[in-house]
Structure formats: structure tokens, C-alpha cells
Amino acid sequence: MCIRDSYSHYQTLTVDSAAEEARWNEMMEAYKDEFPELKAKWETYHYPLQAINTYNDDSYWEFEDKPQATRNLSGVMINRLKDILPNLIGGAADLAPSTKTYMKGEGDFSSTNRAGRNLHFGVRELAMAAIANGIALHGGLRPYVSTFFVFSDYVKPMARLSALMKLPVTYVFTHDSIGVGEDGPTHEPIEQLAMLRAMPNFNVFRPADATETAAAWYYAATATSAPTALVLSRQNLPQLKGASRLTLRGGYILQDSEKEVPDAILIATGSEVQLAVAAKAALAEEGIDVRVVSMPSMDVFDRQVKEYQEKVLPNAVRKRVAIEALSGFGWGKYVGLDGKVVAMPGFGASAPANLLFEKFGFTVDNV
């Protein structure tokens, strides 16, 4: 009897709810006809892919051709996107000057300024991410949060809920490796990147230059059912020849071999892509012709069709080296039993960044 009564009750609710939805849709159509400008804003707020018609707009992808930290480039992108997405809102855990996440001219959100788009979360990373989840659950707004990458440990429980609830929250993590330098091992992330990559429905990008950073932000800003993390450098990185919007496919051929079948493949992310490029040039002098693959997002690359994956990483090439100045965990699936991984063997140390990269084997000769 209880089951039958419950079924009857919910059948009634279904009919009533359908009628309520129809009334709501009718009201919305009338609203759109009466207020076309507000209708356009509504569409922008709720359908970001329609708003961001920038993929073929060259100005979106233009940057100064000089070495820049990807955290700085991310800051440039945030201030470009704020004009395209008026519902973009976000901030940092008391680190906005360092994470470069402040939207210029948009004011600070407060009890007296609800229109402010910069949120000051304070030094409370977990609460920051929880607040962003709430904003995303409400709908209409596009939240982003930021802190140093090593502090992603504090963010992780709420980031996991972002993934579980399919919320398009953007996580901006800077100071992404031993490139942090003198701050030492307490502030040099090692295992954090592998941790985030292991999370289901969570897209992680570690871009190498301006083009890849712009592509990562494009991906994050148009996401609808998954969070995205941007893992960014403190130190300046060169703009790379061959960097491509193919970043949106997770991994791509940055610089190819002249041979149909390369002698070997070098795979890298972020600040180590420049090292792979330099190693390719050095190997060429020895008559070894290699391909350089940039892999800004394992998660996205793993979802590509097999034909594309085979084109980038052909099975016929067994000699592969992955290079990343963090934990090497997870690279085995790309390099295989015949490959090598140049990664951090343990915690970092306190010294200038260039000395640390040399100490831990991130050199052309070692690669």
C-alpha cells in the first residue's frame, strides 16, 4: 500500500511539475520578447560557448613575443575574458597579486558592492573552493579560484566535489614546480599534479607558453560539465615555435621529425617543453631525428579518438622520453616499458630555480 501511494503521489507531482515548467517557459518567452537586450545577456550567462566566439579571432591569441610566466599570461586572459563573459567572477586565497587573478576595473565584491567581480576569500583555500561550488550550483555565473599549486592539497576535497557534481569551476594554480626556487620544498609541488590527474571528470592543463595558456582558458571558459585546473609557472618561459590551438586536443606534435618514423619521441608539459625543444636540437647535431610532443592535458588527450592518438604517439616508435619537473607518476602509459621518464625523484630544495633544474637532471645533456 505504501509503495502504491508513493507512486500515485509522485505521478501527481510529475503532472503538476510539467504544467509548472510550461508556465515558466511561456513566461520566459514573453520576457525575451519584451527585453531583447536582457535576453542576450541571459544567453551569454548560461551558454558560454555561444558567447565566446573567439576561436577564429586572432586578437584572442595575440601576445608579445617575449618570455613570460604562464601565470602572467593567465592574468592577461582573465582580463580579456572579463569583457567577453560579464558573468566571470573569482579571486584568490589572499594571493591575487602573485597568482595574477585580479580583474582590472571590476571592483571588489563586498556587502556594499554586490556588483564587484573580484572576490577576496582570505587564507582559507577549502572554503574558497566550496564557495565557488555554490556559485556554480546556483547557475549563471562562471567562478574561478586561485592559489599556489602546493596548496591544492587544501582545495582538493572541494575540487573533488566540483568533479562529482559536474560543475565548471576553474582552478588557477601557480608556482607549479621546483621553479618556485628559494621558497624551498614546502612550497614546491611534487605529487599534486598526479593527484589532480587521477581525479575523474577533472581536466588539468599545464601550458607551456602564451598560445597554450590561451587555449587552456578557452577550454575552461566553455566547459559545461567538468571543472578545469590551470597549472602555471612562476618563472618566465619562451614563446614556442609550433605552439598550437591543438592544445584543445590535450596533446599535439609541437615540432616534428623530418623522418616519416621518428627516431624517438620527447614528451613534455609546461616549463619542460622548452627543454624538449632544446634536446631535439642537440640530438639533431648527432644525427638523431626526434619528434617533440607537447602534452598540456593528459585528461583531454586520453579522450581523443585512437587515430589521433596514434598520429601523435605512433606505436611503431618505442623510444620515448617524458619530461616533467614533478612526480613521474602516470607517465608510464605514454612511454611504455622501453621508455624513460625524467621527473622529480623526491622533494625539492631551496636554491635559485636554475640551479634546482640542473641539480635534479632537467638539462639537455641528461635528456
Give, region by region, the residue ranges found by the protein language model.
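Thiamine diphosphate
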Residues: 4-5, 12-366, ...
